[in-house]
């Protein structure tokens, strides 16, 4: 089972940016953790990160053309306003889980709304990097049940 993990803007700054919110692990440590846990679950995990909306959309399109079974996406700030990412997710019809390291509902009001989540089968928020593992388990179960 192939899963694409897409991380959006500023996630490459993990371990540098607002450690009290996002944790002390750097981006590469989080990616290594995701890949290790994915392997234990029998998943093929490929991770991508971009600060550019169009590149994120290209990753989503590539997931379709390369026949990925699922997508895990942390759109970063694009969560709150990217209709283009929403449209890309809806367009490829690949089961997707949206993940956020912090609880977006406990933060600034402008972070409470996700325009991308309605294109997903679910959203996981507030569990740090473990949210990605929760998403892998949820996707695996969802895909197997089809």
Curated annotation (Swiss-Prot):
Active site, UniProt feature: 22 (proton acceptor), 100 (proton donor)
Pathways involved: Metabolic intermediate biosynthesis; chorismate biosynthesis; chorismate from D-erythrose 4-phosphate and phosphoenolpyruvate: step 3/7
Keywords: Amino-acid biosynthesis, Aromatic amino acid biosynthesis, Lyase
Positions of substrate binding: 74, 80, 87, 101-102, 111
Entry EC no(s): 4.2.1.10
Enzyme class, first EC level, given as a word: lyase
Keyword Amino-acid biosynthesis (UniProt): yes
Catalytic activity: 3-dehydroquinate = 3-dehydroshikimate + H2O
SUPFAM superfamilies: Type II 3-dehydroquinate dehydratase (SSF52304)
Biological processes per GO annotation: amino acid biosynthetic process; aromatic amino acid family biosynthetic process; chorismate biosynthetic process; quinate catabolic process
Gene Ontology terms for molecular function: 3-dehydroquinate dehydratase activity
Site (Transition state stabilizer) residue list: 17
Gene3D superfamilies assigned to the protein according to its UniProt record, in alphabetical order: Dehydroquinase, class II
Assembly notes: Homododecamer.
NCBIfam families per record: aroQ, PRK05395.1-2, PRK05395.1-3, PRK05395.1-4
Function, as annotated: Catalyzes a trans-dehydration via an enolate intermediate.
Protein family per UniProt: Belongs to the type-II 3-dehydroquinase family.
Protein's UniProt name: 3-dehydroquinate dehydratase
Organism in which the protein naturally occurs: Clostridium perfringens (strain SM101 / Type A)
């Amino acid at each position: 089972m192939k899963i694409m993990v897409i991380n959006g803007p500023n996630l490459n700054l993990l371990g540098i940016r607002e450690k009290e919110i996002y944790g002390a692990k750097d981006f590469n440590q989080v990616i290594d953790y995701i890949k290790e846990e994915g392997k234990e679950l029998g998943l093929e995990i490929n991770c991508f990160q971009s600060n550019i909306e169009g590149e994120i959309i290209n990753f989503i399109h590539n997931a379709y053309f390369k026949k990925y079974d699922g997508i895990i996406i942390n759109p970063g700030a694009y969560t709150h306003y990217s209709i283009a990412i929403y449209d890309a997710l809806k367009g490829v019809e690949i089961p997707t889980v949206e993940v956020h390291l912090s609880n977006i509902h406990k933060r600034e009001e402008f972070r409470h709304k996700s325009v991308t989540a309605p294109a997903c089968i679910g959203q996981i928020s507030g569990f740090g990097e473990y949210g990605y593992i929760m998403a892998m388990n949820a996707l695996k179960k969802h895909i197997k049940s089809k």
